[in-house]
Regions:
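Central cavity-lining transmembrane alpha-helices of secondary-active solute carriers
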Residues: 70-88, 134-141, 332-345
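Interfacial helix-cap and linker-helix signal at transmembrane-aqueous boundaries
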Residues: 57-62, 89-91, 122, 175-184, ...
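Helix-loop-helix hairpins in multi-pass membrane proteins, especially solute transporters
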Residues: 83-87, 91-224
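Helix-to-loop junctions at the C-terminal end of transmembrane segments
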Residues: 81-95, 180, 341-358
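Transmembrane-helix exit segments and adjacent C-terminal regions of multi-pass membrane proteins
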Residues: 3-22, 470-552
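12-transmembrane solute porter fold
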Residues: 30-46, 51-52, 109, 280-450, ...
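Hydrophobic transmembrane-helix bundles of small-molecule transporters
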Residues: 181-296
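Cytosolic juxtamembrane N-terminal segment immediately preceding the first transmembrane helix
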Residues: 1-46, 59
Length: 552
């Protein structure tokens, strides 16, 4: 992506007039967009099941951790699956109806999710909940987009959007763990239901039906059968990667059976994509320049970030013996990093308009600081406060990478295929990349723990336990904790090396083989003056827009 492309997409279009005609006249204009920000945050707090209360759900229902995790992946699949039809829904139904229906569906799903039901039915329920969640969030954020950026500048919109998305994920995890610790895990479901009732009340009392298009566009031409096939395929992929380690991969007949059916489903999906007149995901989406490398890089980065859910959890639960509430409270230190990463992305993409590939490289360097911090700190005798700085860097890195990848897709694709690409992007971004990385990290944990026992067993055999009183169970518990901490440290080291490799790769991505002219890097005072001029330019544009509104 060259600088001209960056400038073209960063500049946006001419300023547009922002209005929210769906509100009744008695609602003050200044508060209208803020109400939708709160509603978007409420939608993002919702889920089918909440992983912050995973251990409590596992203990009460007598199921496995993988079963609860599969509920999360089903919710994410529902969100990813729904992207290609978001605008079709917006152009067919009114804003009020879409928000009220999304809130009502989430209420029903959260009520039913508190009952013990067959797992396939629970997963289907989570898929529907994910669809309602993304529909409500999209309707809120697309309505106030012009309020956030009058030129529809995605260098501003994507960072602000991710402040809401990523912060709500962390807050939801903490609330679920807090309710499970102090009360009962179902209280999180009741809180979400109460928030959805607030959404319904706001829409019923403050708004009226309003269509985004003067003429209603019907839903004809949508490949619903293709959407169902892709949903089944992604559920099969999630099941294989989620349960593969527990089933011992190819040694299980169930794993081989689901793998065979997954390959058949994949073949049917590809055949329909190539021959259907209007497939749900069009083959033309894959023909854009650099789209395949970007999507593959998304999967690789998510695989690296899986250390948060595998290595950190092993360290917290098995070595440090932290409860879920303690871990989620510690995880809130990623919030300052998330906000800082989003604001930094605005400065990079909007004010300075620098190359996005360098921004990805910088985010990977921040990830390396996080991985290196854990590599240095992992031990059974550290203070919990020492882990705050690496977690902050993790939040910064993840926020910048999410924004950068969405910016890349927006820059290289037309609007016609952008939301189809977002669907594939979110499949890799939300669960496939993370599950592949989790499988690799889990395999590494098994190898290094077994290797540690093999190396130590000879020394244990030579110890004369009868020579003095020894609490053998306590001694073995300390040895196991030491091996687990050592394995986590080793795998963080390998993750650090991989992060440095991909950071260097991104720095070299768009460097030509032969440089005909050398561009000198300006001194820091010059860079500071450019940043200051960018801020002043934005202030002048803001004053001009305010004057235009006053004249109107």
């Amino acid at each position: 992506m060259d600088n001209n492309t960056n400038n073209k997409h960063a500049a946006g279009g001419p300023p547009m007039t922002f209005a929210m005609p769906m509100y009744h006249d008695f609602v003050p204009k200044w508060i209208r967009p803020w109400i939708y920000v709160v509603l978007a945050f409420c939608f993002q707090l919702s889920n089918g099941m909440y992983l912050g209360a995973m251990n409590n759900i596992v203990g009460e229902w007598g199921i496995m951790r993988e079963d609860v995790q599969m509920c999360l992946y089903a919710t994410l699949i529902g969100m990813a699956l729904y992207f290609p039809v978001l605008f079709r829904m917006k152009f067919r139904f009114s804003n009020k109806l879409l928000l009220m229906m999304s809130a009502a569906v989430i209420v029903v799903c959260n009520i039913l999710a508190t009952f013990r039901m067959p797992l396939p039915l629970l997963w289907a329920l989570c898929v529907v909940c994910g669809m309602a969640k993304i529909q409500g969030t999209f309707e809120c954020m697309s309505t106030i987009q012009l309020w956030m950026t009058p030129k529809r500048d995605f260098g501003v919109f994507f960072p602000i959007l991710h402040i809401i998305l990523l912060c709500s994920i962390e807050v939801a995890g903490y609330l679920a763990a807090w309710f499970a610790f102090d009360m009962h895990w179902t209280y999180m479901h009741w809180l979400v239901m109460a928030l959805m009732l607030v959404v319904l009340l706001v829409q019923a009392l403050l708004t009226r039906p309003f269509h985004a298009m003067p003429q209603i566009i019907p839903l004809k031409g949508i490949d619903w059968m293709g959407a169902l096939l892709w949903c089944v395929l992604w559920l099969q992929v999630a099941w294989l990667l989620n349960y593969g380690d527990w089933l011992d991969w190819w040694h299980s007949s169930d794993f081989r059976l689901v793998m065979g059916t997954m390959l058949i489903t994949l073949a049917v999906c590809l055949q329909r994509m190539m021959h259907h007149p209007k497939p749900y995901i069009e083959p033309a989406m894959w023909t854009y320049h650099n789209v395949v490398p970007v999507i593959l890089l998304i999967g690789v980065v998510e695989a690296l970030f899986s250390c948060e859910h595998v290595l950190e959890m092993v360290y917290y639960e098995e070595v440090m013996h932290y409860a879920d509430h303690t871990y989620e409270a510690l995880n809130q230190w990623s919030l300052p990093g998330i906000v800082a990463g989003c604001l930094f992305s605005i400065g990079w993409l909007k004010l300075m308009r620098w190359n996005v590939y360098k921004l990805i490289a910088l985010a990977l360097v921040a990830f390396c600081i996080y991985a290196g911090g854990f590599y240095v700190l992992v031990d059974s005798n550290i203070s919990i406060e020492q882990l705050r700085i690496p977690i902050l860097w993790r939040g910064f890195s993840y926020a910048v990478l999410c924004i950068s990848f969405m910016w890349c897709l927006h820059a290289i694709m037309s609007f016609e295929h952008f939301f189809q690409a977002l669907s594939v992007f979110n499949v890799l971004h939300m669960f496939v990349g993370g599950l592949v990385g989790a499988a690799l990290h889990g395999r590494g944990m098994k190898y290094y723990v077994a290797d540690g026992f093999a190396r130590c067993s000879g020394y244990v055999d030579s110890v004369r336990l009868s020579a003095r009183a020894v609490d053998f169970p306590q001694m073995m518990n300390g040895i196991v904790e030491g091996f687990l901490a050592q394995s986590v440290k080793i795998l963080f080291g390998w993750t650090l090396i991989a992060g440095l490799f991909f950071a260097a790769l991104m720095l070299l991505w768009d460097i030509p083989m032969v440089r005909h002219q050398v561009k000198h890097i300006p001194a820091w005072p010059v860079v500071g003056m450019r940043v200051l001029r960018g801020v002043q330019r934005q202030r002048r544009l803001k004053r001009i827009r305010q004057l235009r509104r006053q004249r109107q």
